[in-house]
Amino acid sequence: MGNERLKAPEGPPSDVERIKEESNYLRGTLKESMLEPISAGISDDDNRLMKHHGSYLQDDRDLRNERQKQKLEPAYQFMLRVRMPGGVATPEQWLVMDELAQKYGNGTMKLTTRETFQLHGILKWNMKKTIQAIHSALLDTIAACGDVNRNVMCTSNPYQSEIHQEVYEWSKKLSDDLLPRTRAYHEIWLDEEKVAGTPEAEEVEPMYGPLYLPRKFKIGIAVPPSNDIDVFSQDLGFIAIVEDDKLVGFNVAIGGGMGMTHGDKATYPQLAKVIGFCKPEQIYDVAEKIITIQRDYGNRSVRKNARFKYTVDRLGLETVKNELENRLGWSLDEAKPYHFDHNGDRYGWVKGVKGRWHFTLFVEGGRVTDYADYKLMTGLREIAKIHTGDIRLTSNQNLIIANVTSQKKKKINELIEQYGLTDGKHYTALRRSSIACVALPTCGLAMAEAERYLPKLIDKIDEIIEENGLKNEEITIRMTGCPNGCARHALGEIGFIGKAPGKYNMYLGAAFDGSRLSKMYRENIGEEEILKELREILPRYAKERKEGEHFGDFVIRAGIIKETTDGTNFHD
């Protein structure tokens, strides 16, 4: 019975499928486009392919109208995203990214919600030099975007360094194992000579095939009790199971994803469901087989319904699990107990194993730059020059100066104090629990501000927070400029999605540990209405909450918002 349901949706393939099919394994005419001297942009077809190489063509939307008036083409520039599984960089790699941001980018770095770097403002003529410099630092941008498996995340956990290190190694191997096999990236950016002859498709891309996946695919590994990576937001999530201080394996969760489309109830955020347990060395097999199920049965006709979450919901969880076990040739074990208690970061100095220290730094909005009164970028540059451990980027857009020896701790602490780098302790816990996507001016999808606006909105919300004695109460707040959900808005206890300039849909009721989605509370409201609503709700929370009750749980218990029990009733 189950296998009768195993088929892809009917319908003509989307235009992106045509582009991939004609691209000769992601080559297209990218090489020629990048050499074309007249325009700073590239063709639409090549831009679709460019994602698989880790980049998006963008333009400065702040300048768009003025340039149109002057009959100039948009101020085209590229965003470049690094593939860095687990978010771990060496100090030397940090310094290379810093230098490239200054030399070819807009002078800043964005720390992303998938634990990696983004550089913005790179001109077409500088792209190849930038990618080659990244390659020289033993990093790359392969498959950082596009219809493939993206950057593999793992918990940035300074408390259990040995377990973290082991999980990081698995995430790194998994990322490497799931890379596209085409040599297009190496030929276009690294001047690798093309091998003569046309090999068969299964030789070029044995797992992905010539069309790759119907849509992007995201994997993350969480180490309880921290759900900092929001494991249930992933297409494929692994939950580390630790027994007697040893990693015994992973619970497997499938079918999560945050993106949706305004006004289309057939699109919705969804949480991954746990379907079983596997041993550590089995995660490659599980991941590969899940990806091939999505390759074979995902929606290639309608891209907004093409994510794996819709494949799982359409076919049914049991059907997908049965097909997975059929392809594996073995069955998953029963899922093991686990417990998450938060999805935020833990700030400040922490002592880990082997006498090593870790300092988690608060980076508002993940933007590393020098402000007039806060030399964040310079301070981190000076630390990287003397640091002998590593630097871990977190999925909440912060960073950890990790594996600091006791001898180095004093000097690094002096630099932290000299440059005023902060663990955020003088901010409200709400601000420390905030994340925002880039949005305007560079993201072409943004309908409203996010990163540039959320800190200003929090300034005003903080007044309500302080008045009600909630300064130290962690409440997750997230803002995205569009419904694609890069800042995982649907897992924020307070969430905002941009609807139009200055207007947002407001969401409430997600779980503090990332195990429940929010629900829309108010539609298309501006700052005045946002603050009015919070002036009513936050004082009630301060007065009426039970001991230890989180804000997302309170608004449901108090009847302020209806509970979302599954993504399929997100819009109800």
Curated annotation (Swiss-Prot):
UniProt pathway: Sulfur metabolism; hydrogen sulfide biosynthesis; hydrogen sulfide from sulfite (NADPH route): step 1/1
Note on cofactor: Binds 1 siroheme per subunit.
Keywords from the UniProt entry: 4Fe-4S, Amino-acid biosynthesis, Cysteine biosynthesis, Heme, Iron, Iron-sulfur, Metal-binding, NADP, Oxidoreductase
A Gene Ontology BP annotation from the UniProt entry: hydrogen sulfide biosynthetic process
Keyword Amino-acid biosynthesis among UniProt keywords: yes
Name of the protein in question: Sulfite reductase [NADPH] hemoprotein beta-component
A Gene Ontology molecular function term of the record: metal ion binding
Cofactor: siroheme; [4Fe-4S] cluster
InterPro entries, per database record: CysI, NiRdtase/SiRdtase_haem-b_fer, Nit/Sulf_reduc_fer-like_dom_sf, NO2/SO3_Rdtase_4Fe4S_dom, NO2/SO3_Rdtase_4Fe4S_prot, NO2/SO3_Rdtase_4Fe4S_sf, NO2/SO3_Rdtase_FeS/sirohaem_BS
Annotated EC: 1.8.1.2
Gene3D superfamilies recorded: Sulfite Reductase Hemoprotein, domain 1
Cited Pfam families: NIR_SIR (PF01077), NIR_SIR_ferr (PF03460)
Keyword check for Iron: yes
Gene Ontology cellular-component terms listed: sulfite reductase complex (NADPH)
Upper taxonomic lineage: Bacteria, Bacillati, Bacillota, Bacilli, Bacillales
Top-rank taxon: Bacteria
Oligomer and partners: Alpha(8)-beta(8). The alpha component is a flavoprotein, the beta component is a hemoprotein.
